[in-house]
From Swiss-Prot:
Keywords: Chloroplast, Lyase, Magnesium, Metal-binding, Plastid, Transit peptide. Its cofactor is Mg(2+). The gene is KSL5. This is Ent-kaurene synthase 5, chloroplastic. Ubiquitous expression in roots, stems, leaves and flowers. It catalyses: ent-copalyl diphosphate = ent-kaur-16-ene + diphosphate. Abietane diterpenoids (e.g. miltiradiene, abietatriene and ferruginol) accumulate specifically in the periderm of roots. The ent-kaurene diterpenoid oridonin, main constituent of Isodon rubescens, accumulates in leaves. Involved in the biosynthesis of ent-kaurene diterpenoids natural products such as oridonin, miltiradiene, eriocalyxin B and nezukol, known to exhibit antitumor, anti-inflammatory and antibacterial activities, and in the production of gibberellins phytohormones. Catalyzes the conversion of ent-copalyl diphosphate (ent-CPP) to ent-kaurene. It comes from the Eukaryota. GO terms for molecular function: ent-kaurene synthase activity; magnesium ion binding. Its main location: plastid. Mg(2+) 2 binds at residues 543, 547.
């Protein structure tokens, strides 16, 4: 880890050689088309950007904290209270004052004036304590006097504990005979805010007050019980991994472990310290999270795997760096669980219990922590995690209230589109937003600055930088070019197979392709995308044929043709519509089977035909039930309805085309069928909830109407829908658990992910309206396929 001496230096200089993941080399297919000098230059820039990002995995840079360095500079020698223990820190302060008299970091944000005031006053106190730097002290005092009004300015971001620490430092300044000419009204306002903050803390429970006061120990003066503070000392000797708090503790108690921590920090960083140390696990997880959320993780698979393995080892060892920090714990839990590691949710539940234990909001005053905990609390896999479920609902309500009242303004990151980010987290749960859609939103909401605020501001290129953004934008747009060409190919396929001549069928090629491109977006997975999209079009056509377009004779004829397979369509099709549909089916199945044969090394034709026959049989059964006006039991209905929802032909053939070998034993395994049933059941129930009233008017059955009927008509529609939603929730969580599970799994993870991807598709499609009728989808389709991201718009 090294320190960044400038807040603006988020990205280091270019370097000649770097470790780039070889595991993802094949994923550049279709992207490196350097057919002109301009394209060659773009390709070179692309690789250089990847190289700089790869370098972040081998170091963790943090910005210097002048505030913390000042408090460390105040530490007296253990052998003489008249001498500084760390004169190098004192020299650093003397050499790093700004031209305006402050000790601000270069290019500091205009909303960080309170931070600058606090840091500057701390530096003045350090110099005055040791009787050095009279010129710097006078310039610093002049800066504080000129900018003192900012200490109570409402539009400024207030660092943690500022309302207590800053007045305490002013008292210290008076005790050191520093002559500060301060505006009386502002000073009175500051004292009033300090008293208000102390009163608020005293009204919280004793444990919360104690930990908060311990964290801002340097500002508590005679109110501080230093022995109680030391309960929070960590194994590395620090208090909260915070140099300023630890320095104040050593000054008060001469604790040797505190001193050892400070010495180790300075051995690591030289003559200045960061605001938090160590931060290695969090920094590395932030890098991984940035890459995953922006859609560029596939370029760094080896590096990411190394971080995940190391984080998991630290998790199992109970590392304080993870479990003593809410943000790190939540991020580690979410990242590990979503990558298939077996981690318990107990630490997240404990954090949430502490957050909601009283009116003192503790961790939830910081937007980073709040969002991390919320995202982590969504990842419920097991029935016994019900407590986490309840806390998630409460946290969602809290976020909604804070959003409506602009409660995050004081705690947000600088330059961050916080409203959009929080709104996205609330409106689009992780299970109801398609992968590429989420990536685009994350890119659009991305904040290059990514300054964090504790008692002072701090930054790291691992938290965020322009390389993450530029690589993700370039990658998104390159993939989009490929996707647009594939959509044109799909539209040609529709015409070539005469599907456009079927007047009864909905024209949904763009939507079908969109669901493929938004979930299976990598360039080299073109065959899987096209299989998904073409079968999506065909299932829509067949669904409309069974629903409104075909007679019973035509439906039976279509099924018979698929059963026989090798037929003369000119003589054995009973109508032009049947001929068009069967011909398109056969041509597409054979095309997909040929591609699958090349990847799998065995014939998959019979299996794909079987998948289609299962769908046709289930649709025919529904037709016959409608004709007979008979009402099955709920179990009878669902045993057929999950198949007739028609996800089988879309998802199952595509499994053969995503890369891994899929043996006959695998596709006959119970895991394969369970994944399919869970995914399809979610889709069927979502569809039946949204279409309940329409189906009721048309005299058709649905899961909702049958549930009411099977319960003697004694429950309300609302109660029936509530039961359906609970069913969906159970199956969705079980599906995710099986997708993420690796130890007992038979299917390759790349194949299992497709079941989850489709689950997110149906959750999005049925969010508001009934399936394809959602007006929101039109804009989303354009954003994913047609509209490039323009970097200079950010």
């Amino acid at each position: 880890m090294s320190l960044l001496l400038s807040n603006s230096a988020l990205v280091g200089p270019k370097f000649r050689s770097s470790r780039i993941s070889h595991a993802s080399a094949s994923l550049d297919i279709g992207l490196q088309r350097a057919t002109s000098p301009q394209n060659a230059s773009v390709a070179t820039c692309f690789e250089e950007t990847k190289g700089r990002i790869a370098k972040l995995f081998h170091k963790n840079e943090l910005s210097v904290s002048t505030y913390d360095t000042a408090w460390v500079a105040m530490v007296p020698s253990p052998t003489s209270s008249e001498e500084p223990c760390f004169p190098a820190c004192l020299n650093w302060l003397l050499e790093n004052q700004c031209h305006d008299g402050s000790w601000a970091r270069p290019h500091h944000h205009h909303m960080l004036k309170k931070d600058v005031l606090s840091s500057t006053l701390a530096c003045i106190l350090a110099l005055k304590k040791w009787g050095v730097g009279e010129e710097q002290i006078n310039r610093g005092l002049h800066f504080v006097e000129l900018n003192f009004a900012s200490a109570t300015e409402k539009g400024q971001i207030t660092p943690m504990g500022f309302d207590i620490i800053f007045p305490a430092m002013l008292d210290n300044a008076r005790g050191l005979s520093l002559n500060l000419q301060l505006e009386p009204t502002t000073l009175n306002d500051l004292i009033y805010k300090r008293d208000l903050e102390l009163k608020r803390c005293n009204q919280s429970n004793s444990a919360e007050k104690e930990v908060y006061w311990a964290h801002i120990a340097e500002g508590m003066g005679k109110l501080q019980d230093w022995e109680s503070v030391m309960k929070y000392q960590r194994k590395n000797g620090s208090l909260f991994n915070c140099p300023s708090t630890t320095a104040a503790a050593f000054t008060a108690l001469r604790n040797s472990d505190c001193l050892n921590y400070l010495r180790l920090a300075l051995e690591k960083f030289g003559s200045a310290v960061p605001a938090v140390y160590p931060l290695d696990i969090y920094s590395q997880l932030c890098t991984v999270d940035n890459l995953e959320r922006l859609g560029i993780s596939r370029y760094f698979l080896t590096e990411i795997q190394s971080v995940l393995d190391e984080t998991y080892r630290s998790w199992l060892q109970g590392d304080e760096e993870i479990f003593m920090d809410a943000s790190t714990c939540a991020l580690a839990f979410r990242t590990l669980r979503m990558n298939g590691y077996n981690v318990t949710s107990d630490p997240i539940t404990k954090i949430l219990q502490e957050c909601f234990s009283s009116s003192f909001r503790g961790n939830m005053t910081d937007i980073n922590t709040t969002l991390e905990i919320y995202r982590a609390s969504e990842l419920i896999l097991y029935p016994e995690e019900r407590d986490l479920d309840q806390h998630n609902l409460r946290l969602k309500t809290f976020l909604e209230q804070e959003l409506s009242s602009n409660g995050f303004i004081q705690s947000c990151q600088l330059g961050r589109n916080i409203n959009a980010e929080v709104n996205q987290a609330i409106e689009y749960p992780f299970y109801a937003i398609m992968d590429r859609m989420a990536k685009r939103k994350n890119i659009e909401n991305y904040n290059i600055d990514n300054t964090r605020i504790l008692k002072t501001s701090y930054r790291s290129p691992n938290f965020g930088n322009k390389d993450f953004l530029s690589l993700s934008v370039e990658d998104f747009n390159r993939c989009q070019v490929i996707h647009r060409e594939e959509l044109r190919e799909l539209e040609r396929w529709v015409i070539e197979n005469r599907l456009d001549e079927l007047k009864f069928a909905r024209s949904k090629a763009a939507y079908c392709y969109f669901s493929a491109a938004a979930t299976i977006f990598s360039p080299e997975l073109s065959d899987a995308r096209m299989s998904w999209a073409k079968n999506g079009v065909l299932t829509t056509v067949v669904d409309d044929f069974f629903d409104v377009g075909g007679s019973v004779e035509e439906l039976k004829n279509l099924i018979q043709l698929v059963e026989l397979w090798d037929v003369d369509v000119s003589t054995q099709c009973c109508s032009p519509n049947v001929q068009i549909i069967f011909s398109a089916l056969k041509h597409t199945i054979c095309e997909i089977a040929d591609k699958g044969f090349k990847l799998q090394g065995r014939s998959i034709t019979d299996h794909i035909i079987s998948i289609w026959l299962d769908l046709l049989y289930s649709m025919m059964k529904e037709t016959e039930l409608g004709i007979d006006k008979s009402f099955p039991t709920m179990d009878e209905y669902m045993s057929n309805a999950y198949v007739s929802f028609a996800l089988g032909p879309i998802v199952l053939p595509a499994l053969y085309l995503v890369g891994p070998k899929l043996s006959e034993e695998m596709v006959n395994h119970s895991e394969y069928h369970t994944l399919f049933k869970l995914m399809s059941t979610c889709g069927r129930l979502l569809n039946d909830i949204r279409g309940y009233e329409r189906e009721l008017k048309d005299g058709k059955i649905s899961a909702v109407s049958l549930y009411i009927m099977n319960n003697g008509g004694e429950i309300t529609t609302e109660a029936a829908i509530s039961e359906m939603r609970s069913w969906i929730e159970r199956d969705r969580r079980e599906l995710l658990r099986l997708v993420l599970e690796e130890n007992k799994s038979v299917l390759p993870k790349a194949c299992k992910k497709l079941f989850w991807h489709m689950c997110t598709v149906v959750h999005l499609f049925y969010r508001k309206d009934d399936g394809f009728t959602s007006l929101d989808l039109h804009g989303v389709v354009n954003a994913i396929i047609n509209e490039p991201i323009v970097l200079n718009q950010f």
